[in-house]
A protein has these predicted regions:
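Metal-dependent amide/peptide-bond hydrolase catalytic core
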Residues: 1-135
């Protein structure tokens, strides 16, 4: 008996379908080679977050105008419900940091209350700039 578990994230829906089919075919082929069988249980989560350059640039520009330190994030394929919106329209998923603290899913995560008005101003500016650009 063998067990394999993992996460696969791809930006393209066609690529996701292809990878799923290939994983199933590989599992069946390997199992057959050892006179066994394979069962593949596939749980589909949200697609990978994929920011578009246009909105990413606007988010960075607006953050700089608000006096925020703009940090280049390590490329990362976040699995986030926001990605479903991104399948419908161009957008940008941005992080707003509040200083050194445990990450957002950590039980000791807290938000610095002083950061809330600054984040709200940033989001309002982003909305205003986005509306100007799409009109």
């Amino acid at each position: 008996r063998a067990w394999m578990e993992g996460t696969i994230r791809l930006f393209d829906a066609n690529d996701r379908a292809l990878v799923k089919a290939r994983v199933e075919a590989l599992a069946e082929g390997i199992a057959t080679g050892f006179d066994g069988y394979a069962e593949v249980a596939w749980t589909t989560g949200p697609p990978a977050v994929a920011n578009t350059e246009r909105w990413n640039d606007l988010a960075r520009k607006t953050a700089a105008q608000e006096g925020f330190a703009v940090v280049d994030a390590v490329p990362w394929m976040a699995g986030e419900d926001f990605a479903y919106y991104q399948e419908l329209m161009e957008s940008c998923f941005a992080f707003i940091g509040t200083g050194p603290a445990p990450e957002n899913h950590h039980p000791k995560f807290t938000v610095d209350p002083a950061a809330i008005p600054m984040a709200a101003r940033y989001l309002v500016r982003m909305a205003e700039e986005a509306l100007r650009q799409i009109q």
